[in-house]
């Protein structure tokens, strides 16, 4: 049985114009991770990632590094109980 993990992530920094949301969505889909991602009105990125632990943390790694052009200042990662998300979406 796979070890399912769910994390709630907030990314801050100079992220505008970097396609951060789409990069997270693409990486999550590639890794088979479910959940969602969105840009908040204050410029931060918020995401919920759920799936096998290793795959979830690969997406968290992208959040820490950011896509080209992003200057990530901070990443907050909080674990949550899995909720059996079925898809990944951009909100």
Role assignments for model-derived ranges:
Residues 1-91:
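Intrinsically disordered, low-complexity, mixed-charge
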């Amino acid at each position: 049985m796979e070890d399912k993990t769910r994390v709630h992530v907030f990314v801050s920094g100079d992220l505008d114009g970097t396609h951060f949301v789409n990069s997270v969505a693409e990486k999550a889909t590639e890794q088979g991770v479910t959940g969602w991602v969105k840009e908040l009105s204050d410029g931060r990125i918020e995401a919920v990632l759920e799936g096998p632990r290793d795959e979830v943390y690969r997406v968290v790694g992208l959040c820490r590094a950011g896509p080209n052009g992003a200057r990530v200042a901070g990443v907050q990662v909080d674990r949550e109980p899995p909720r059996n998300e079925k898809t990944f979406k951009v909100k």
